[in-house]
Amino acid sequence: MFDIGFSELILLMVLGLVVLGPKRLPIAIRTVMDWVKTIRGLAANVQNELKQELKLQELQDSIKKAESLNLQALSPELSKTVEELKAQADKMKAELEDKAAQAGTTVEDQIKEIKSAAENAEKSQNAISVEEAAETLSEAERTPTDLTALETHEKVELNTHLSSYYPPDDIEIAPASKSQSSKTKS
């Protein structure tokens, strides 16, 4: 790159040693080597970009030539294909319009069905609320012993649910009461 021979390199090292001294010479060599690496990297990057641009330009030129040759030779075939595609698109558009017209009447019928289903749901809800009112009246007529039986059943159910989540505490681990602790001290 610089046409420097071995003897010239030795001469530069001796001159650098005299000018910079033994402490600064290694630092200066590292700095110069970093500059050389950076310059080489930039040069390689520029060369790669130029090669890519040239390839891209060649491809664009060849594509333009191929298009001009193919369009002249294939124009009757392309026009037939374009006409066929337009005919198919018009046919599909007509089918979609027919389906849309049919769907419009179907939507109206569906709205009527939904309204009737909502009315039936209201009627069944009213019937359920009447049954619930009858059950509450029958609960009000129950005797206190029936209510007590229900309460004990509910307590047992609650205890089983709680014991599944929280295991029962050990009685032996419980702290001693004040009277027991005073007896042990005396």
Curated annotation (Swiss-Prot):
GO terms for cellular component: TAT protein transport complex. Keywords: Cell inner membrane, Cell membrane, Membrane, Protein transport, Translocation, Transmembrane, Transmembrane helix, Transport. Residues 177-186 have a biased composition (Polar residues). The chain crosses the membrane at residues 1-21. It is found in: Cell inner membrane. Its main location: membrane. InterPro entries: TatB. One of its GO terms (biological process) is protein transport by the Tat complex. It is a single-pass membrane protein. One of its GO terms (molecular function) is protein transmembrane transporter activity. Residues 120-186 are annotated as: Disordered. Gene3D superfamilies: 1.20.5.3310. The Tat system comprises two distinct complexes: a TatABC complex, containing multiple copies of TatA, TatB and TatC subunits, and a separate TatA complex, containing only TatA subunits. Substrates initially bind to the TatABC complex, which probably triggers association of the separate TatA complex to form the active translocon. Part of the twin-arginine translocation (Tat) system that transports large folded proteins containing a characteristic twin-arginine motif in their signal peptide across membranes. Together with TatC, TatB is part of a receptor directly interacting with Tat signal peptides. TatB may form an oligomeric binding site that transiently accommodates folded Tat precursor proteins before their translocation. Belongs to the TatB family. This is Sec-independent protein translocase protein TatB. It comes from Haemophilus influenzae (strain ATCC 51907 / DSM 11121 / KW20 / Rd). The gene is tatB.
